């Protein structure tokens, strides 16, 4: 029997959640060989990258371009702040590497289009982190495909996080400064509620929306034609101060007359 290939993976920043490179490292056919980031990133970025590289006994190099050219990689794992996802993924694709990236794909639609073009142009694969293969989702898909629940006409997903997001809405006293988004996210890293890590504030629809939207797309197998969404800030002072949502509802019209809806939010201890 031919020996299975081991794929060499480079981690392009690992400053947010590190579950993505850890998942890759846990697979027997993947090997993490290097962590890389751009030299002009702030100190906290380099510190987190170095800590992860040290844990896995691999080098941390402050030169993404050099690593892409010189380390004989098969794929890149992108786990930076959301606003840098597309830039790093495009650079990896242009270097001929397959890409596994953390969500969201980007905070801007134009950047998503650029990434899709780069993937197609270079004939590489792109995988965005998702939860489509959780047991409950698989069971739902089997029930739909088997006809056990009849013909699908409508689908709804509730997706809420109970992770905290700092002080509750309304707790900031007169004269207190607004909560700084990046500082709050850096503090939240310890308990895993830093999904919006980055300079640019992000609401929950941006941070977590891929999950329920991914479920709907997978379970229906059809495209969305019309969307109506509404966002609000009900729970967390950091979201109020930075003008981003912590609760959202979305209504969808899909092909074949199917309608979809989702509710999503980070409700903390509410």
Place the predicted regions along the sequence by residue.
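Hydrophobic residues in well-ordered beta-strands that form the structural core
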Residues: 62, 101, 126-128, 156, ...
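Rossmann-fold dehydrogenase core element
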Residues: 114-131, 151-155
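Short, Asp-centered acidic motifs that coordinate Mg2+ and/or phosphate
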Residues: 34, 74-75, 154
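NAD(P)-dinucleotide binding in Rossmann-like oxidoreductases
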Residues: 231-234, 238-270
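Beta-loop-alpha module in the N-terminal Rossmann-like domain of NAD(P)-dependent dehydrogenases
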Residues: 56-118
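Predominantly a Rossmann-like dinucleotide-binding segment in NAD(P)-dependent oxidoreductases
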Residues: 15, 134-230, 234-240
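N-terminal Rossmann-like dinucleotide-binding module
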Residues: 1-55
């Amino acid at each position: 029997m031919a020996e299975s290939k081991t794929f060499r993976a480079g981690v392009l920043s690992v400053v947010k959640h590190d579950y993505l490179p850890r998942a890759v490292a846990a697979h027997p056919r993947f090997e993490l060989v290097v962590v890389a980031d751009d030299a002009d990133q702030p100190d906290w970025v380099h510190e987190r990258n170095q800590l992860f590289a040290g844990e896995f006994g691999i080098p941390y190099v402050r030169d993404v371009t050099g690593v892409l050219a010189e380390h004989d990689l098969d794929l890149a794992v992108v786990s930076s702040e959301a606003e840098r996802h597309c830039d790093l993924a495009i650079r990896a694709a242009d270097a001929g590497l397959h890409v596994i990236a953390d969500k969201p794909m980007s905070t801007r639609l134009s950047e998503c289009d650029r990434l899709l073009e780069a993937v197609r142009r270079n004939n590489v694969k792109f995988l965005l982190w998702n939860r489509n293969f959780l047991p409950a989702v698989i069971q739902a898909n089997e029930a739909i495909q088997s006809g056990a629940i009849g013909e699908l006409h409508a689908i709804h997903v509730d997706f809420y996080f109970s992770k905290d997001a700092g002080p509750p809405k309304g707790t900031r006293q007169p004269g207190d400064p607004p909560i700084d988004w990046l500082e709050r996210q850096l503090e939240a890293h310890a308990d895993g509620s830093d999904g919006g890590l980055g300079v640019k504030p992000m609401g929950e629809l941006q941070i977590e929306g891929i999950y329920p939207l991914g479920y709907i797309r997978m379970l229906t197998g059809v495209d969305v034609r019309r969307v109506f969404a509404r966002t609000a800030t009900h729970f967390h002072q950091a979201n109020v101060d930075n003008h981003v949502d912590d609760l959202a509802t979305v209504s969808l019209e899909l092909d074949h007359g199917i309608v979809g809806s989702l509710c999503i939010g980070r409700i903390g201890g509410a």
